């Protein structure tokens, strides 16, 4: 599926919504993701499970920031999956490598 088709389908299904690109909100998410990564690293030797959970949150926040910059946001009850799908379809082949 092409990126364009993915966007069309997810908008039609109500999984994505268009919005004005938001640099300020994206920046806040990136700064929070940086803190999350620092926290994950600090906790790795203490509790590996927590470290991975916090690292996952960093990935999610970073990807949501990217979506905001592209003029989209996830909606409905599948937000985590929608964010991952968005990045997969945007990055395409590069993500697989």
Model feature map: region roles:
Residues 1-97:
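Terminal alpha-helical segments
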């Amino acid at each position: 599926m092409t990126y364009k088709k993915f966007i069309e389908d997810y908008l039609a299904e109500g999984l994505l919504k268009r919005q004005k690109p938001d640099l300020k909100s994206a920046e806040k998410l990136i700064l929070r993701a940086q803190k999350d990564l620092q926290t994950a690293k600090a906790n790795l030797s203490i509790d590996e499970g927590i470290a991975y959970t916090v690292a996952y949150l960093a990935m999610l926040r970073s990807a949501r920031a990217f979506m905001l910059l592209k003029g989209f946001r996830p909606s409905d009850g599948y937000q985590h999956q929608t964010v991952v799908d968005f990045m997969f379809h945007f990055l395409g082949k590069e993500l697989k490598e």
